[in-house]
UniProtKB/Swiss-Prot annotation:
It comes from the Eukaryota. CDD domains: ATP-synt_F1_alpha_C, ATP-synt_F1_alpha_N, F1-ATPase_alpha_CD. NCBIfam families: atpA, PRK13343.1. One of its GO terms (molecular function) is proton-transporting ATP synthase activity, rotational mechanism. The keyword Cell membrane does not apply. HAMAP family: ATP_synth_alpha_bact. This is ATP synthase subunit alpha, chloroplastic. Belongs to the ATPase alpha/beta chains family. Keywords: ATP synthesis, ATP-binding, CF(1), Chloroplast, Hydrogen ion transport, Ion transport, Membrane, Nucleotide-binding, Plastid, Thylakoid, Translocase, Transport. Produces ATP from ADP in the presence of a proton gradient across the membrane. The alpha chain is a regulatory subunit. It comes from Nicotiana tabacum (Common tobacco).
Length: 507
């Protein structure tokens, strides 16, 4: 018979008591009262924070936006088709954040920073909050470096600087996305990281942009954040903040970044949809009262950082769509008041064959010539004035029958200047080529040509100058100034090319 030893048993019990680890885990949970239209009403979750992520039983993630006395309004980051009434929900204790790293370059991701290009997972060890505070006044410095778009009309008359926010506004189908993608293409070799955020676009349009960037080798320094028209409203609302978080990651690492939001009208509509479903009180045009804050907190994150923070920059090009050219609608006026200027694209100009269809008269850059190199300031000074005078004269000339010689000459010059501003899509020009083009037009060298010959002559002149006078490009790129030597070289090239061109045309 086995003897029971009391001391041995008591030792075992004592050891077990000592090893016992009393760990109390408190989980903030709730129950689904109602779900539908991308919104869930939750009972419980008493200690949830505004904007906190919550996790449903079947794995869907949501954001707690409405904290009411008897329930919590949660917007779903997914379709939520498997969520049932009565199922449990738990608070995660986290605010929305995404992984960030250099590995995102060249990839297409969604608003949750998950890859959607079928090229596997993206490795990242660092995380960044989707919504973070914008740099303060002391953290910034004034904008002084140019960000070249490659479009003559913009770089000469509506210059954009690194750290600026410049709105691109116009009706649908006026070339807003084309201006943005051309700007990305022109950053090749400029050491600028680009982030293109597509909000509520057709999947085919996004695919077309990605294909263009891949063909031109621009995806190497670009990240595309895409939430197409069939995505839940929550993800369309979050996409711009995800893009901004990625751009900020590079900005704080002393890099220059360019971010394009295409377009913020769709983000505002997604936010309106969410707000109305959450039964928040609607305001003007049924948008929520804080729709201004929606865009201001996003665009204020663009900045030129001070030298103590490494002088990185984040330049924002938000796009807003207007209805029949009405810039006085709610969202356009909001974004105009937040940004440092706007590029207005006109449907009338687009339809009359002037592309890019930039209305120079009402487009403005509030940074101005501070964002231009000295050489560009020297040649582009009188271009805007001459074009403004031409537009006024042209309107007057429609009613006047007989015009004096000076007026006729001014009209002829204006037509040629307007012609030199035309550019094909995906064909950005270097700053040296732009300076050469503007100088040729404003100094009357094109006056002897027919309007239809202007573009052909300029294309040939660019090739001739590059081949036969490479010193011109070297002087501009090294000194950033339009020196007398550069001017002499350019005059020679124009004269030689003009003689060749006239002989060709006569042949």
């Amino acid at each position: 018979m086995v003897t029971i030893r009391a001391d041995e048993i008591s030792n075992i019990i004592r050891e077990r008591i000592e090893q016992y680890n009393r760990e109390v885990k408190i989980v903030n949970t709730g129950t689904v009262l109602q779900v539908g239209d991308g919104i869930a009403r939750i009972h419980g979750l008493d200690e949830v924070m505004a904007g906190e992520l919550v996790e449903f039983e079947e794995g869907t993630i949501g954001i707690a936006l409405n904290l009411e006395s008897n329930n919590v309004g949660v917007v779903l980051m997914g379709d939520g088709l498997l969520i049932q009434e009565g199922s449990s929900v738990k608070a995660t204790g986290r605010i929305a954040q995404i992984p960030v790293s250099e590995a995102y370059l060249g990839r297409v991701i969604n608003a949750l920073a998950k890859p959607i290009d079928g090229r596997g997972e993206i490795s990242a060890s660092e995380f960044r909050l989707i919504e973070s505070a914008a740099p303060g006044i002391i953290s910034r410095r004034s904008v002084y470096e140019p960000l070249q778009t490659g479009l003559i009309a913009i770089d000469s008359m509506i210059p954009i600087g690194r750290g600026q926010r410049e709105l691109i506004i116009g009706d649908r189908q006026t070339g807003k996305t084309a201006v943005a993608t051309d700007t990305i293409l022109n950053q090749q070799g400029q050491n600028v990281i680009c982030v293109y955020v597509a909000i509520g676009q057709k999947a085919s349009s996004v695919a077309q942009v990605v294909t263009t960037l891949q063909e031109r080798g621009a995806m190497e320094y670009t990240i595309v954040v895409a939430e197409t028209a069939d995505s839940p409203a929550t993800l369309q609302y979050l996409a711009p903040y995800t893009g901004a978080a990625l751009a900020e990651y590079f900005m704080y690492r002393e890099r220059h970044t360019l971010i394009i939001y295409d377009d913020l009208s769709k983000q505002a509509q997604a936010y309106r949809q969410m707000s109305l479903l959450l039964r928040r009180p609607p305001g003007r045009e049924a948008y929520l009262g804080d729709v201004f804050y929606l865009h201001s907190r996003l665009l204020e994150r663009a900045a030129k950082l001070s030298s103590s923070l490494g002088e990185g920059s984040m330049t924002a090009l938000p796009i807003v769509e207007t209805q029949s050219g009405d810039v006085s609608a709610y969202i356009p006026t909001n974004v105009i008041s937040i940004t440092d200027g706007q590029i207005f694209l006109s449907a009338d100009l687009f339809n009359s064959g002037i592309r890019p269809a930039i209305n120079v008269g009402i487009s403005v850059s509030r940074v101005g010539s501070a964002a231009q190199i000295k050489a560009m300031k020297q040649v582009a000074g009188k271009l805007k004035l001459e074009l403004a005078q031409f537009a006024e004269l042209e309107a007057f000339a429609q009613f006047a029958s007989d015009l004096d010689k000076a007026t006729q000459n001014q009209l002829a010059r204006g037509q040629r200047l307007r012609e030199l501003l035309k550019q094909s899509q995906s064909a950005p020009l270097t700053v040296e080529e732009q300076i050469m083009t503007i100088y040729t037009g404003t100094n009357g060298y094109l006056d002897s040509l027919e309007v239809g010959q202007v573009r052909k002559f300029l294309v040939e002149l660019r090739t001739y100058l590059k081949t036969n006078k490479p010193q011109f490009q070297e002087i501009i790129s090294s000194t950033k100034t339009f020196t007398e030597e550069a001017e002499a070289l350019l005059k020679e090239a124009i004269q030689e090319q003009m003689d060749r061109f006239i002989l060709q045309e006569q042949a």
